[in-house]
A protein has these predicted regions:
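Short beta-strand/loop motif that positions the catalytic acidic residue
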Residues: 331-338
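Alpha/beta-hydrolase active-site loop
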Residues: 147-169
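Short alpha-helix in the alpha/beta-hydrolase fold that links the catalytic acid
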Residues: 194, 328-329, 342-353
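C-terminal catalytic histidine-bearing segment of alpha/beta-hydrolase fold enzymes
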Residues: 225, 304-315, 319, 340, ...
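Accessory cap/linker subdomain of secreted extracellular hydrolases
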Residues: 214-323
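Short, surface-exposed "cap/lid" segments of acyl-processing enzymes
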Residues: 72-80, 84-123, 140
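Catalytic-loop region of hydrolases
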Residues: 20-90
Length: 431
């Protein structure tokens, strides 16, 4: 009898251990650096960032993490990201996920000079546990990144949340259950995809408190498509989409997606999309024609234009994010002067969601003049203000406006940047 009980006991322990292993998504975590409040103040001063808009309240530990997440074929793949952990925390804090903009270069490093990483760092020191997912195929993850692909974007966020839930137990980091999602440009699409999939998943651990997608292409088959047929500052978007959707969906009956491109692009593009992807977006942009469609063979352009059942068009529709009804509050940030991601993406999303009965949704036009790059700063500020209302006031926030003095300073700063933008028309891409 005693021997039988021992066997049963070890059988139970073995089954429990197997279940634990099966449900484990965290692969590795490494503390890379710690920022003290003193070092953050020096960084803020160097970058002329007022603490009024980005308060410094905590030292921050920065972790490089790897985790396992579900790929489009159902298999589990390695992904990576950065986790910013506030220190000397006296009470449970909310979690914020920031999804970064378009990137093709795989070798992401933790850097104090990266503007997007700075958003996550700023959130952490102000009082959020802050996640910066790389997406699949960027950083130290496996495979290739799928551009503007809602499911893989969402899974990169969701499985990182699972991994961080495990890591928080190891770090004794206590969250208050609030979850905020945001991102800029592609990150706007990715964060909104994560919102949609999280609500569908309905995991009680990860209920979305609010989301604030910024300047994203939520309507993949609408106004955004006009840029394919005119001079466009970022022609790399089109081949990036085609290569990504071929890997995800096999949109063409060919093993060589590059056969869709005219010469010399059919031989140049593999150098940028295959292998280790060591080139940046600027390098890719420099080899492409000003009008994106001019890189594609005419018969494929004709198929896209005239055949509503073209597989590429169908797959684009599947990745639209405007026609659903979120449960959690939403703010859509954009600038009307954006010539890269049409502001009508946000307008249409707002209109369709209100038709679907969504009431707690805000359409926030931050400037009629600022473009895709210069809009980002003000979109982030508006997002922080939006999230802080829920952070401090829970499910029923006091939806007060920005304090008058702070609003005045924001107005002065915006006018100054608008004036500089009109005079310089910088083409540098930040997001």
């Amino acid at each position: 009898m005693k021997k039988y009980l021992i066997i049963v006991f070890f059988s139970f322990v073995s089954q429990f251990a197997s279940a634990e292993q099966k449900d484990s998504f965290l692969v590795s975590y490494t503390l890379v650096k710690t920022h003290t409040q003193k070092s953050l103040k020096a960084m803020w001063k160097k970058n002329k960032l007022p603490t009024m808009f980005a308060p410094i309240r905590h030292d921050v530990d920065i972790y490089e993490i790897t985790y396992r997440g579900k790929w489009v074929d159902g298999s589990m793949r390695l992904a990576s990201g950065i986790y910013y952990v506030p220190k000397e925390v006296k009470k449970p804090l909310p979690t914020m996920v920031f999804c970064h903009g378009t990137e093709i270069f795989k070798g992401r490093k933790i850097s104090d000079n990266d503007a997007q990483q700075g958003i996550s760092l700023g959130a952490a020191t102000s009082g959020y546990y802050s996640l910066f997912p790389d997406y699949f195929g960027i950083g130290s993850g496996e495979g290739n990144h799928l551009y503007q692909h809602a499911e893989s974007e969402a899974n990169a966020v969701i499985y990182m949340l699972y991994a961080i839930d495990e890591l928080n137990k190891k770090l004794n980091a206590k969250t208050n259950g609030q979850l905020f999602l945001t991102g800029y440009s592609q990150g706007g699409h990715a964060s909104f995809a994560a919102h949609k999939y999280l609500e569908k998943l309905n995991d009680p651990r990860f209920q979305v408190t609010a989301s604030s997608p910024m300047s994203g292409a939520y309507d993949m088959t609408g106004d955004q498509t006009k840029f394919m047929f005119q001079k466009y500052p970022r022609p790399f978007y089109l081949p990036y989409l085609l290569v990504s959707y071929q890997e995800a969906y096999k949109i063409l009956n060919t093993s060589n997606i590059y056969a869709i491109f005219k010469s010399p692009y059919d031989t140049l593009l593999p150098n940028y999309f295959e292998g280790e992807r060591k080139h940046g977006l600027g390098d890719l942009n420099s080899i492409l024609p000003e009008i994106p469609k001019d890189a594609i063979k005419d018969d494929y352009i004709s198929e896209y234009t005239n055949n509503p059942d073209f597989t590429f068009t169908k797959r684009l529709k599947e990745n639209n994010l405007f026609d659903w009804k979120p449960k959690a509050p939403v703010q859509l940030c954009y600038c009307q002067g954006d010539r890269e991601v049409s502001y009508l993406n946000s307008v249409k999303t707002y209109e369709e969601m209100t038709k679907n009965g969504k009431t707690d949704i805000k359409l926030n036009n931050l400037s009629p003049r600022l473009d895709h790059n210069t809009c980002a700063l003000f979109a982030v500020m508006a997002t922080v203000n939006f999230f802080d209302r829920y952070k401090y006031h829970g499910k029923n926030p006091k939806l007060k406006d920005v304090p008058p003095f702070k609003k005045m300073l924001l107005g002065i700063l915006k006018k100054r940047i608008e004036k500089q933008y009109v005079s310089s028309k910088s083409d540098k891409a930040y997001f």
